[in-house]
Amino acid sequence: MRTSNYLLSTLKETPNDAEVVSHKLMLRAGMIRKLASGLYTWLPTGLRVLRKVENIVRQEIDNAGAIETLMPVVQPFELWEETGRSEKMGPELLRFTDRHERPFVLSPTAEEVITALVRNEVSSYKQLPLNLYQIQTKFRDERRPRFGVMRAREFCMMDAYSFDIDKAGLEKSYEAMHVAYCKAFDRMGLDYRPVLADTGAIGGNGSHEFHVLAESGEDLIAFSTESDYAANIEKAEAVAPAIERPAPTQAMTLVDTPNAKTIAELVEQHGLPIEKTVKTLFVKASDEIDAPIVALIIRGDHELNEIKAEKLAEVASPLEMASEEEIRALIGAGPGSLGPVGLKLPFIVDRTVAVMNDFGAGANIDGKHYFGINWGRDVELGKVEDLRNVVEGDPSPCGKGTLMLKRGIEVGHIFQLGTNYSEKMNCGVLDSNGKNVILEMGCYGIGVSRVVAAAIEQNHDDYGIIWPDAIAPFQVAIVPMNMHKSERVQQAAEKLYAELTAAGIEVLFDDRKERPGVMFSDMELIGVPHTIIIGDRSMDEGHFEYKNRRQGEKEAVAMESIIDFIQAKLA
């Protein structure tokens, strides 16, 4: 491709609304342009990368035995009513009516559509297992689209759906897709981790997320230092401390704390170690208990894991914190002065808090705390659960090593749905005994457009993008120095361009009438992995200059050896 015939569209300045590195560089490199909030046009450079990611995904999903199909972006609303997800998805599900007042939605995912298809097309166990996928545009009406294509409203996604006669078959399909994901991300040259995950709104029995590691990642991932264990922080178990609760050494005392409305203020003003404090959080209760509110008690330096809390039978779902007005009406004190002693409401204690002694907590009186609280002596312990997020140094749930935390960008997710959708939509087949069996489903997604952004977050420097070879928009750039002033340079560049192209190599030939500095800057910005520099001086010495984008070092390569040299680099 010649730049003179190409829409390069690079920018010197970064638009003001770009926040993360990938958004800034995708705009500056001429990969995308914003049309409206969360909506982007993919320019030629960006589309080349997107298509390469798509093709790698397609090849590996094909190799896993899945079959490609294509479903409509517009879906009948009635299908979503069959599964009950019409309300669960909330406002992210964009709804509209056609001219005949029939309700439709723009597809955020396709569980309902694919299940309806299979229940009509598949009738016998002999047609199983079956795994169908598509690579298609999706739409989710994000409340706050941000970070460019990382969290856009419209995005490109690979979504696959497996159907099996039993759970053993589902597990086999799930494992095959897990392997396919790893192969795809390996080929893309990404540093990623598959991690245990919560099933979220899609539901099901088992789930893994695939995260590209990057400091800008929105998710925290917990890893074992001595095993392959990895989990999203929402899913990672905080193992119960392997100690017995120490005996009391202090008497419980009531202390005036008029200016300590937070744990930090309590620690600063009264010298109490933060690991000797607890915080009491009031949340709405479920119908399972005879109380409007239930209290959750965690250590002062720990954070409540809302996903874990929401799964407790006593807690309403979705999780909702009690308001200050509700708390005062029940307790007579505000949120900064709450604790378990004398509490007339049900409460649940975190595992770590259950082994604490001599700790401090609110006295359920404004401006007062109890110090030296001990379980059993001052208040009954009650129910103990895992309520908190893990922290670095916690024991790994696998029993090997401790946990470390890193940030990740979720680019893929796989679920064992079981019969969650197939039962609601009556999707079954006749087994070998002629009995109708509801199918076991799996669903699998890769955010193709998000992969592009995640790769940039992981591969960039001060000059621009550093693409892994497999997904770079071009493999090689030719930068001829002052070509329009030197016929010899022009002839050499044209000859090399023709030879590389004939060898099946994707080349960007910068034939613009631009200063060399501008040409070099653009090639570094868009991230072409290999650059060949042609100039009169180097040709006088019988060589071209080669520059590797990742290493940044220049190397002299004999003119007659350049094709073999480049082919070896790309092998």
From Swiss-Prot:
Q: What is its EC number?
A: 6.1.1.15
* Catalysis performed (reactions): tRNA(Pro) + L-proline + ATP = L-prolyl-tRNA(Pro) + AMP + diphosphate
Biological processes, Gene Ontology terms: prolyl-tRNA aminoacylation
**What's a Pfam family in this record?**
HGTP_anticodon
Could you tell me where this protein is found in the cell? Cytoplasm
**Cross-referenced CDD domains:** ProRS-INS, ProRS_anticodon_short, ProRS_core_prok
GO MF entries:
aminoacyl-tRNA deacylase activity; ATP binding; proline-tRNA ligase activity
Supply the alphabetized keyword list: Aminoacyl-tRNA synthetase, ATP-binding, Cytoplasm, Ligase, Nucleotide-binding, Protein biosynthesis
Example of a GO cellular component annotation carried by this entry: cytosol
Name the family.
Answer: Belongs to the class-II aminoacyl-tRNA synthetase family. ProS type 1 subfamily.
What does this gene product do?
Catalyzes the attachment of proline to tRNA(Pro) in a two-step reaction: proline is first activated by ATP to form Pro-AMP and then transferred to the acceptor end of tRNA(Pro). As ProRS can inadvertently accommodate and process non-cognate amino acids such as alanine and cysteine, to avoid such errors it has two additional distinct editing activities against alanine. One activity is designated as 'pretransfer' editing and involves the tRNA(Pro)-independent hydrolysis of activated Ala-AMP.
Subunit details: Homodimer.
Q: PANTHER family annotated for this entry?
A: MITOCHONDRIAL RIBOSOME PROTEIN L39/PROLYL-TRNA LIGASE FAMILY MEMBER, PROLINE--TRNA LIGASE
User: What's noted about domains in the record?
Assistant: Consists of three domains: the N-terminal catalytic domain, the editing domain and the C-terminal anticodon-binding domain.
Name of protein = Proline--tRNA ligase
